[in-house]
């Protein structure tokens, strides 16, 4: 996810147990796939835009393997330079929600179109895990895909951020919560 905060006051991430501030986030930041919950307050005057990618499909938008940002929150400038800061400034120039979405969509397509290739085997696995997490057996899926367990797990981790087994656990949890 990419989070754009329209206020200048930092948002804080809190330790889930002690609720102590552990990280400040300001303006624009990126969050990898999470295997654990994150505690961020959303006050009644918060104004943010969150870009959530389709499940497992964020890799095309990041300049490094997704495993490097899993369970992390990183300042967008460290990931992409100042491009997202400039995007934020453009978004601050309008209050029209529909226009903000069009600006973000145009920006993402312009900046990342050439990188939007997705490994078809990983896309297939994500689709299977998302659509029927309770019925899926990873070993049988690996056999269908045709890669060794180790090779496929590495491909999957680089594109999604976690192993197929961890991703399947997340999908099962999300299904149970629904």
Regions found by a protein language model. Give the residues of each.
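Terminal helix-turn-helix DNA-binding modules in bacterial transcription factors
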Residues: 159-163, 167-178
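Residues within the DNA-recognition helix of helix-turn-helix
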Residues: 155
């Amino acid at each position: 996810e990419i989070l754009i905060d329209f206020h200048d006051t930092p948002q804080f991430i809190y330790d889930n147990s002690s609720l102590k501030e552990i990280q400040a986030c300001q303006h624009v930041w990126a969050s990898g796939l999470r295997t654990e919950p994150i505690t961020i307050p959303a006050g009644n005057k918060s104004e943010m835009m969150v870009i959530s990618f389709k499940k497992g499909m964020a890799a095309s938008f990041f300049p490094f393997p997704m495993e490097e940002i899993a369970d992390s929150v990183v300042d967008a400038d460290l990931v992409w330079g100042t491009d997202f800061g400039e995007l934020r400034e453009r978004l601050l120039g309008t209050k029209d929600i529909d226009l903000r979405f069009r600006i973000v969509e145009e920006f993402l397509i312009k900046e990342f179109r050439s990188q939007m290739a997705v490994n078809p085997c990983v896309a297939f696995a994500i689709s299977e895990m998302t659509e029927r997490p309770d019925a899926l057996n990873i070993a049988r899926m690996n056999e269908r895909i045709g890669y060794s367990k180790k090779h496929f797990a590495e491909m999957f981790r680089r594109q999604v951020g976690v192993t197929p087994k961890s991703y399947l656990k997340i999908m099962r949890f999300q299904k149970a919560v629904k």
